């Protein structure tokens, strides 16, 4: 027979013994006896097979108490909410009917093929600064998004407020500050407080008919670009992306897990953990996945780390590699969409264990250069055309076939679909299923044909209590989950088993023995071995015998008679 608890946290026997409600004698480290770990019971509760009903009830009460704690812990830790975020906005517009000042005002009546370039960003300072005040062109290399010989105008459309910006790309300060972009005209700079900004760019061509435009393949770009803190100059202020940096991608904040220069893939993931793990630590990622830091080894000045990724207790992936600020350890497990970066390792003063600065991500996406992440939208990286140290005159270029780590300033999606040769008022071109490029003639007003970016987007985000996410340029923190919003969580309920079903020699977990030597065979075994002392005169007692159950600790809950055992059980329940 088995006596099961009715419910399903991490809890230790607390020092609530001081309540004084129940008088009980403590032997050993009673307060340190852990009964729940990570939502699961750590001990079997054992009652004698010939025990009186009172002892069986005591065991069931202990099991039920542990079970109720599991239920509360699980409910609090597992409570989450799915939120829907909706955002809509429009950028400034450019009236193509009065865009020019070089003798003719109407762009749409220029010779067919003449081009106009427009840009918007999460903050207008970035879009404004992309237009070169001296040349009138954008700071973009020729034939990347437009043909400079055909360009009639380059215009900033200010901000599209629903685009996203990450204000601190290196929240844990993994990388040391170098000279800031504003101070020197070289690529050798880095700012821990840098920003990453979403931008939209498009080139349209005149059809010389006064009412329609053409949008060519390769003429529209969505981009997420890293900048020096509060400096919006693309030529001087952009900074190279590094593993662990945060950046927005299609309205959500991601961490850069890996720039894979072998397969030319950019891996991005959503942060689960960013902090320090100690050698031997195991971190619960969720969905049955755990990351274990198996070992951190030092040879000279070099550190190597051994990691294991487990699913339901079984190792599904492992990595052993060196780690440093210039060579982070990266581990990606594609079946579980999990990405891990270890940026730095060190030892404690006594040199007997190590630590690793670790980022764990989930929902990892793989952006392969030259491939369509979304139909008609190809993955590119944002680069500069100047590869020497001097970048003061550098311009934006795009790469769709090769990742160059020291020349990657952002990631983008470039339009590679069919040419749109009849783009007119009332039509919209969807940009990466995220934003739109629109034309509006204000009800056929002869002097109006406004070109602008817009967004009307809805995204869902699932958050645990206390978690923060950035969605569509909104920071959202879930402070709590109300009871009626929580779904039931399944746990393995603790069971009271009989002393004939478990032995001290073969136990695979801790044991809680309810009943004295007369009522419980395992308690008698401990008494006969001299590990506890208990007679018919013994008071209510809680005694911990370290390692007595096949190396696992044993907690004896007993007394000299049934009443004393019940009192000991009630004292334990009071302390939990």
Swiss-Prot record:
Modification after translation: N-linked glycans consist of the 779 Da trisaccharide beta-ManNAc(Thr)-(1-4)-beta-GlcNAc3NAcA-(1-3)-beta-GlcNAc.
Compartment annotation: Secreted, Cell wall, S-layer
Source species, domain of life: Archaea
Keyword Aminoacyl-tRNA synthetase: no
UniProt KW Plastid keyword: no
Keywords: Cell wall, Cell wall biogenesis/degradation, Glycoprotein, S-layer, Secreted, Signal
GO CC entries: extracellular region; S-layer
Transmembrane segments: none
GO BP terms, alphabetized: cell wall organization
Signal peptide, first to last residue: 1-23
Residues that carry a glycan: 102, 132
Protein role: S-layer protein. The S-layer is a paracrystalline mono-layered assembly of proteins which coat the surface of the cell.
Family: Belongs to the Mj S-layer protein family.
Protein name (record): S-layer protein
Organism: Methanococcus voltae
Source organism phylogeny: Archaea, Methanobacteriati, Methanobacteriota, Methanomada group, Methanococci
